[in-house]
Curated annotation (Swiss-Prot):
Entry keywords, A to Z: DNA replication, DNA-binding, DNA-directed DNA polymerase, Nucleotidyltransferase, Transferase
GO biological process, one term: DNA-templated DNA replication
E.C. numbers: 2.7.7.7
Species assigned in the record: Aeropyrum pernix (strain ATCC 700893 / DSM 11879 / JCM 9820 / NBRC 100138 / K1)
Basic and acidic residues composition bias: residue spans: 44-60
Protein family membership: Belongs to the DNA polymerase type-B family.
Region annotated Disordered, chain positions: 1-110
Domain of life: Archaea
Name of a matching Pfam family: DNA_pol_B_exo1
Reactions catalysed according to its record: DNA(n) + a 2'-deoxyribonucleoside 5'-triphosphate = DNA(n+1) + diphosphate
Gene Ontology MF terms: DNA binding; DNA-directed DNA polymerase activity; nucleotide binding
Protein name as it appears in the record: DNA polymerase 1
Length: 959
DNA sequence: ACAGGTCTATTGTAAC
DNA sequence: GTTACAATAGACCTGT
């Protein structure tokens, strides 16, 4: 039998690390392996039925090891806990007895306080393990990098402290004697370890350079010494890379895959080359050089490795608050946590409650299969909660970084638990557990690239409610009273629902989101806690840095890349508020067109990056002789060597287009495999779509304006060239935007000519995207309505489709669209127009008569900043927000304000304060007008031309 | 002083 | 990341 999770090793390690004090305590009662493993983390083991579940009791000896509480609670009560879940039926029938029961001491004790403490402070160190690498941390007290691995054989997370002797360092062009001569002899620094002479390839200078590696014992010393060295006029490199990242890059680790760690070796266990893998890769990359094909084979093994399945637990806490609308401040944690719910991936759910005078159970049933416990002592409750959470390798929260974790941590301090017994680590911008990993879904779903490319902009607000509504089709439990005033049944129901939603957001659709995270970790080479908290530019940075290290390339400094930027021809006129020129949007016609085909360039920008060898070191590099000029902007792209960005982007693009898009739809594969491949291709899509954007963003460490500028310039050239060719071929292009062309009723063979031309001339793939049976153009850019051959309706950019358009307009507009969808041939136009006219007349009258509800009149607009930060002017939604704030409601950045337009002087009112009689119909007529006009314009008529409307308007105005 | 007009800037949302 | 649109705020001008 296998050693379980290296637990034996863990014991050894503990002995060596423990202080005398801790050893002594363990002497009291040795925690058995079983105690530790008995947690719910073992997915296979069936859970005991709730009635058999018995919590360990009592906690009277707690005081021996933990300091006295601040005296807020009477000792006799604070240290005792009631009989748990098994009794909750009794509470139901005799709620009046809750108090009596809570004071009843339990007859049995299974776990002493020492065990509780031990479990809280113990760290699962191992010397060897076979497990999935999930993250790397830096442990300050050890002064070492620590691998966090999930061991599937024990179902738990283990830690492995570095034994490879890796140390923090940075690079400089100064030799040790130069530093001495310049009076910055860093070797006297207390953290200094040694100088190493290293040779690296400089990607811009295109030659090997000899550098001094200043090795230190402490990552903080890097920052300190870097300042010294650079202020003496020397160049420094790679000094701003976080140490735990440096460790991953240097050891060439791939988070998210299975490793065997032991001794000083960290070896991945990727599946050996599958027979057909070589064949597939050779086929896809047959035109690439040998090294690229070899790289591709390694990538393939990473993508093909199945994702880990690990036990997850989601949790959420509810805190008492005297002011219903305000959450207590986690930095002071002044009020008690009254409830905490957990839901795990094996289907188990628990709620722990704090006993409060006068707050009782009601008749209603409790959620099925849920273990409920009431505590007299908040401290015991929180410690138990943390203990349970820490048994899982991965804890999930919604906003845990900014609320739940800091609150619990601070609250435990307030309750007299010393910091070292509360295994929560509050980092600079996030919070986690000492022994578990933590994902905050609020941060994860706030990553814009995911929002847009992975979730198709389905949710707008970053709240648990709106995200789960959009992705799971269900929301939070609706409350009629503030959390602090709920009876216990409702509190349990509400709290638990939040925990369950949180869990489900990660696990729905066969672990879609979790698997996506794993895939992104593997690609970016960053740990799970980094990936889930950083924007895509950091993901790409991880991948690029890792790749630089693999090639033994020096990672250039911002300044070095910046220099190439100014070396460029730079002819483009400076555009106001913009850094560079973007894409072309063709002027659309006004009218209705039948049989319009849409062609688009498959991943235009990434393809251009690949085809044109665009990378920070290939554009405007003076160390390259053989260059080719980018039209319009005049940047010169190197042809002598292959760039790093385009190689990576090109590889991901090819994998996606040629392999994984197909695999995700391959019916011969098992459902689970297909879903995985869909995740793989989605992750690649996120990457390649962002690959162009990051070069134009200062936040990206390899920021290169010439690259971004060249991409868009080439995009324009390609679109223009294709347009010209279309004219030659007598194709009628009606519209186009960035990478698409709308062609009116083309002969089929001519279309093929165009596709061939694009392939030949630009090496790009032009694909048929859609065929519209009919399409309406309003004459506005990015604004059309089409009906495809299959009868699907495609609406782009129209006012009626925008999220800030009142609901009734959307409803009425979609009725109009239904009428329109009958449109098949030109002869239908007249009849349909007549029908539309009727409908619009009705709508007009309905608005004037206000037949809609207040909610339907609501305009929903997001606050892009906190209300007080609007200093230039005060938009309507901000005015409405301020009215709400006067009532004590706090509104902040990211919140959506619902308001109606009113007749009073201010002109707006939040829906919460408005009545239907406040609504100004005249202002809504204007709104309706713009919405429908975008449809009517295609028919060649304007709003005023709709007969009757004008008459009615006058009539109503006159009266 | 102020109503009503023009013009520009700000803001939010969407397409790509 | 840029391009594009709608709605509106606020500055400025003009006529009374």
């Amino acid at each position: 039998m296998r050693v379980r999770g290296g637990q034996e090793a863990a014991q050894d390690k503990e002995t060596s690390l423990d202080s005398d004090e801790e050893r002594g305590r363990r002497g009291l009662r040795q925690t058995t392996l079983l105690d530790y493993m008995a947690g719910p983390a073992k997915p296979k083991k069936p859970e005991p039925p709730p009635t058999l579940h018995r919590e360990r009791e009592p906690e009277s000896k707690y005081q021996n090891t933990l300091p006295e509480t601040t005296g807020k609670e009477p000792a006799s009560m604070s240290l005792r806990r009631n009989q748990p879940s098994s009794k909750h039926e009794e509470y139901n029938s005799e709620s009046g007895d809750v108090r009596g029961l809570t004071l009843e001491p339990s007859p049995q004790s299974e776990l002493s306080d020492d065990d509780v403490i031990l479990e809280l402070v113990r760290e699962p160190w191992v010397e060897s393990v076979r497990g999935y690498l999930l993250d790397v941390r830096y442990d300050g007290s050890l002064g070492k990098a620590v691998l966090m691995l999930y061991d599937p054989s024990s179902g738990s997370l283990v830690k492995w402290a570095d034994r490879t002797g890796h140390k923090p360092y940075f690079l400089t062009d100064a030799r040790p004697e130069d530093l001495r001569a310049a009076g910055v002899d860093v070797s006297h620094d207390e953290s200094f370890l040694q100088y190493d002479l290293v040779e690296k390839f400089h990607p811009i200078d295109r030659k090997l350079v000899k550098l001094t590696k200043i090795v230190v014992s402490d990552p903080l010393a890097v920052r300190r010494l870097r300042e010294k060295v650079s202020s003496a006029g020397f160049s420094v490199w790679e000094a701003d890379i976080k140490y735990h990242h440096n460790y991953i890059f240097d050891r060439q680790l791939i988070p998210g895959i299975l490793y065997e760690v032991g001794g000083v070796r960290i070896v991945h266990t990727l599946p050996l080359e599958m027979d057909d893998a070589t064949r597939i890769v050779d086929e896809i990359f047959r035109e690439e050089p040998r090294e690229v094909r070899e790289r591709a084979r390694e990538w393939l093994r990473i993508f093909e490795a199945p994702p880990p399945k690990l036990p997850l637990i989601a949790f959420d806490i509810e805190v008492y608050s005297p002011i219903a609308t305000r959450l207590p401040d986690p930095s002071t944690a002044p009020y008690p946590v009254i409830s905490a719910a957990t839901a795990d991936s094996s289907g188990r759910s628990r709620v722990v409650l704090l006993y409060r005078d006068g707050v009782e159970f009601t008749e209603g049933a409790l959620p099925e299969g849920t273990e409920v416990e009431i505590y007299d002592s908040e401290r015991a409750m929180l410690l138990d909660l943390v203990r349970i959470l820490q048994r899982y390798p991965l804890v999930v929260s919604f906003n845990g970084d900014n609320f739940d974790l800091p609150y619990i941590a601070r609250r435990l301090e307030v309750l007299g638990v010393p910091r070292e017994f509360a295994p929560i680590e509050l980092k600079q911008d996030y919070a986690t557990f000492r022994r578990s990993l933590h994902i905050d879904l609020h941060k994860l779903f706030g990553i814009r690239a995911l929002q847009v490319y992975a979730f198709g902009n389905k949710y707008r607000e970053l709240s648990l409610e709106s995200i789960s509504r959009a992705l799971l089709g269900k929301g939070k439990v609706e409350l009629k009273a503030p959390v602090s005033e709920l009876n216990l049944n409702k509190l349990i129901e509400y709290n638990l629902q939040d925990a369950r939603l949180t869990l489900e957001l990660l696990t729905f659709s066969n672990n879609l989101v979790f698997n996506l995270i794993i895939m992104v970790m593997r690609t970016s080479k960053l740990g799970i806690e980094d990936i889930t908290r950083s924007q895509i530019s950091n993901w790409i940075r991880g991948l690029m840095y890792w790749e630089h290290r693999r090639r033994r390339w020096l990672i250039p400094s911002r300044g070095e890349i910046e220099k190439l930027s100014s070396a460029g021809a730079r002819v483009g006129a400076i555009i106001k508020d913009k850094k560079y020129r973007g894409a072309i949007v063709l002027d659309p016609p006004v009218g209705i067109f039948f049989r319009v085909l849409v062609l688009d360039f498959a991943s235009l920008y990434p393809s251009l990056i690949k085809q044109w060898n665009l990378s920070y070191e290939t554009v405007n590099n003076p160390n390259c002789r053989d260059t080719i000029e980018v039209p319009e902007v005049g940047h010169r792209v190197c042809r002598e060597f292959k760039g790093i960005s385009n190689e990576i982007v090109g590889m991901l693009r090819d994998f996606r287009v040629r392999l994984y898009k197909k695999k995700s739809k391959d019916k011969s594969l098992r459902e689970e495999e297909r879903l995985w491949y869909d995740v793989v291709q989605s992750a690649m899509k996120v990457y390649i779509n962002a690959s162009y954007g990051v070069f134009g963003s200062e936040k990206f460490s390899l920021y290169s304006l010439p690259v971004a500028e060249s991409v868009t310039a080439l995009g324009r050239a390609v679109l223009r060239g294709t347009l010209e060719k279309s004219r030659e071929l007598n194709l009628h292009i009606v519209y186009g935007d960035t990478d698409s062309l709308f062609i009116w009723d083309p002969p089929k063979d001519v279309l093929n000519d165009l596709v061939d031309y694009v392939e030949r001339t630009y090496g790009l793939e032009l694909e048929l995207d859609k065929v519209f049976r009919a399409i309406l153009f309003s004459g506005l850019k990015k604004n059309y309505l089409g009906i495809t051959e299959e009868g699907d309706i495609v609406i782009k950019g129209m006012v009626a489709k925008k999220s800030n358009t009142p609901e009734f307009i959307k409803d009425e507009f979609s009725k109009a669209v239904k009428i329109l969808s009958k449109l098949e041939k030109p002869e239908d136009v007249e009849a349909i127009l007549a029908e539309l006219r009727d409908h619009i007349n009705t709508v007009y009258n309905n608005v004037k008569k206000k037949v809609y509800t207040l909610d339907q009149f609501a305009i929903k607009v997001m606050l892009s900043k906190n209300p007080r930060e609007y200093d230039k002017n005060t938009p309507q939604h901000v005015k409405a927000a301020m009215l709400l704030q006067r009532l004590g409601l706090t509104l902040s950045r990211g919140d959506i304000v619902y308001y109606v337009k009113t007749r009073d002087k201010l002109g707006v009112k939040p829906v919460q304060l408005a009545r239907l009689s406040d609504v100004d119909p005249g202002k809504y007529v204007e709104h309706v007008k713009t919405a429908f006009e975008q449809m009517l314009m295609a028919f060649g008529i304007s709003w005023d031309d709709i007969s009757g409307v004008r008459k009615l308007d006058r009539l109503l105005f006159d009266s």
